Design a protein with these regions (language model features):
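HhH-family (HhH-GPD) DNA N-glycosylase catalytic core used in base-excision repair
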Residues: 1-194
Length: 194
């Protein structure tokens, strides 16, 4: 399924101005910067049980609240900082999600130390090359794959939280490890075929 807006054919989930901008500029674009990868990992975890539109609306607030997703700073958050975040109505005030952000920052730094970068680590799950799918409709797109299962298992082993396979697959889609734009979407070809 696709949606048309200004004669461009898009994936059908891009329905409002915010999601259209995200779809057209970010979703599925191969991402290699560690801070950007960390941002998406945290946002995908925050989205668990909520709509992605909710997270997109709060994204700027998350950047401000979480020191622009600087993992070194977040890894040093203490109980008082977590309490402060729990009182911040501009973000999702879920104690487990906020605590996992701190834990994920610590685990992220360890991965950077071990692999040289989080980018080098995370792209190994697709053999360092974007996987390009050929879906004709959103109904065909899976919620998880063997690659997201493997990523989830390894991230959990390394101490990350809120990284179930479905969250990992959404992360893979967001940062372009996979191109899951439907084939009729103008972004499918614009991003490339791997």
């Amino acid at each position: 399924m696709t949606s048309k807006s200004s004669t461009l054919v898009r994936c059908a989930w891009a329905r409002n101005q915010l999601s259209i901008r995200y779809h057209d500029k970010e979703w599925g674009v191969p991402t290699h910067g560690d801070r950007r990868l960390f941002e998406f990992l945290i946002l995908e975890g925050a989205q668990a049980g909520l709509s992605w539109d909710t997270i997109l609306r709060k994204r700027a607030n998350y950047r401000a609240a979480f020191d622009h997703f600087d993992p070194k700073r977040i890894a040093r958050y203490d109980r008082r900082k977590i309490q402060s975040l729990l009182g911040n109505s501009s973000i999702i005030r879920n104690r487990l999600k906020i605590a996992s952000t701190v834990q994920n920052a610590k685990a992220f730094l360890k991965v950077q130390d071990e692999f040289g970068s989080f980018d080098r680590y995370i792209w190994q799950f697709v053999d360092r090359k974007q996987r390009v799918n050929s879906w004709r409709s959103l109904k065909q797109i899976p919620a998880r794959t063997p690659q997201s299962d493997a990523m989830s298992k390894d991230l959990k082993k390394r101490g990350f939280g809120f990284v179930g396979s479905t969250i990992c697959y959404a992360f893979m889609q967001a940062v372009g490890l996979v191109n899951d734009h439907v084939v009729d979407c103008f972004r499918y070809s614009a991003i490339g075929r791997g």
